[in-house]
UniProtKB/Swiss-Prot annotation:
Pfam families: tRNA_Me_trans, tRNA_Me_trans_C, tRNA_Me_trans_M. The gene is mnmA. It catalyses: S-sulfanyl-L-cysteinyl-[protein] + uridine(34) in tRNA + AH2 + ATP = 2-thiouridine(34) in tRNA + L-cysteinyl-[protein] + A + AMP + diphosphate + H(+). It comes from Pseudomonas aeruginosa (strain ATCC 15692 / DSM 22644 / CIP 104116 / JCM 14847 / LMG 12228 / 1C / PRS 101 / PAO1). This is tRNA-specific 2-thiouridylase MnmA. It is an enzyme of class 2 (transferase). Residues 102-104 are annotated as: Interaction with target base in tRNA. The active site is at residues 107, 203. Coiled coil: none annotated. The record marks 132, 347 as: Interaction with tRNA.
Length: 375
């Protein structure tokens, strides 16, 4: 990376500073590219008891240290009300309905690329920037969202619900880099976040056990655990604590005449409040041939007058899967070439055309794969 003086640009960019290494290096790179750069630290969660489970104070201090080091101003903004209304209430409603949501996707759409973008524009910014591992490309009069260059860190799955108009106002400096390069840049320039661990999990839960957190907001409704033959073999403490494909924490090991194969969650019967389980990592009911998705968001309009061959992910870090997508009266139906394991209602399916992230939606239902004949 050249150390020569950058050509000054007129564009003013406000970087979403999380207190992590990716946003830190993003701000530095933009400075080196000649942009007028400022930072903004978002607080999206307020604890009633004053306990900062999501390390907000530490993160703010790290963000401030980086901004001081590279010589830029740091703004702060509290989007906790917007987060509660537009992300957290939906998160609770999905769990109450027996689904397994992904709040990070809604947070990106409603907070980072809406509330933050609007706030930054109000402060006089021309553009915003984040430390996401994605890329953007302007083509044919619209802005496309592309996978990050580092396949191990690509975050396009989480940004699929952000519209092209918002992507067009956003920069992603580390999307062109691999993670080791980012840390090396941070270390070379003495940034406080150079060796800071990547954040994992959901911010508002932090280090707490997920079940303990959820109990604060949703009453647990215990019920039976049944096999696919209808035999009751245990009790669950609440359907919301379990997800399709789950193996750990079922409490049903060591049953007589059950064999040694581990038990897995195969489904949920919401009407009867029953958790359905089966044995074996390759249990047929763990695999699906197709899914139905709703609440579809496209980065840019997608033509689907006839079925279209695409690639898709039904979870983060999954390799792209070949499928055919068609629009039906019920929603968007994706039929896969190969069996898909543990397709989970409430999670997102995201569609790709090569490196271009087209968009995606929320999985409503999955169709079992017929291993006895044609799929």
């Amino acid at each position: 990376m050249s150390e020569s003086a950058p050509t000054p640009r007129r564009e003013r960019v406000i970087v979403g500073m999380s207190g992590g290494v990716d946003s830190s290096v993003s701000a530095l790179l933009l400075l080196q590219q000649g942009y007028q750069v400022e930072g903004l630290f978002m607080k999206n969660w307020d604890e009633d008891d004053g306990t900062e489970y999501c390390t907000a104070r530490e993160d703010l201090a790290d963000a401030q240290a980086v901004c001081d080091r590279i010589g830029i101003k740091l703004h702060t903004a509290n989007f906790a009300a917007e987060y509660w209304d537009n992300v957290f209430e939906h998160f609770l409603a999905e769990y109450k309905a027996g689904r397994t949501p992904n709040p990070d996707i809604l947070c990106n759409r409603e907070i980072k690329f809406k509330a933050f973008l609007d706030y930054a524009l109000m402060l006089g910014a021309d553009l915003i920037a984040t430390g996401h591992y994605v890329r953007r490309r302007d083509r044919d009069g619209r802005t496309e969202l592309l996978k990050g260059l580092d396949p191990n860190k690509d975050q396009s799955y989480f940004l699929h619900a952000v519209g092209g108009e918002q992507i067009a106002r956003s920069l992603f400096p580390v999307g062109e880099l691999e993670k080791p390069e980012v840390r090396a840049i941070a270390e070379k320039h003495g940034l406080a976040t150079a060796k800071k661990k990547d954040s994992t999990g959901i911010c508002f839960i932090g280090e707490r056990r997920f079940t303990d957190f959820l109990k604060q907001y949703l009453p647990a409704q215990p019920g039976d655990i049944e096999t696919t033959e209808g035999k009751v073999i245990g009790r669950h403490s609440g359907l919301m604590y379990h997800t399709i494909g789950q193996r750990q924490g079922l409490g049903i090991g060591g049953l007589k005449e059950a064999g040694d194969d581990p038990w897995y969650v195969l489904g949920k019967d919401l009407q009867r409040n029953v958790l359905l389980v089966g044995q074996g990592n390759d249990h047929p009911l763990l695999f699906s041939r197709a899914l139905l998705a709703s609440r579809i968001y496209w980065v840019n309009p997608v033509e689907l007058e006839r079925p279209r061959r695409l690639r898709a992910k039904v979870r983060y870090r999954q390799s792209d899967q070949d499928c055919v997508l068609e629009k039906t009266a019920e929603g968007y139906r994706a039929v896969f070439d190969e069996p898909q394991r543990a397709v989970t209602p409430g999670q997102s399916v995201v569609f790709y055309d090569g490196d271009v992230c087209l968009g995606g939606g929320v999985i409503e239902t999955a169709e079992a794969w017929d291993f006895g004949g044609r799929p």
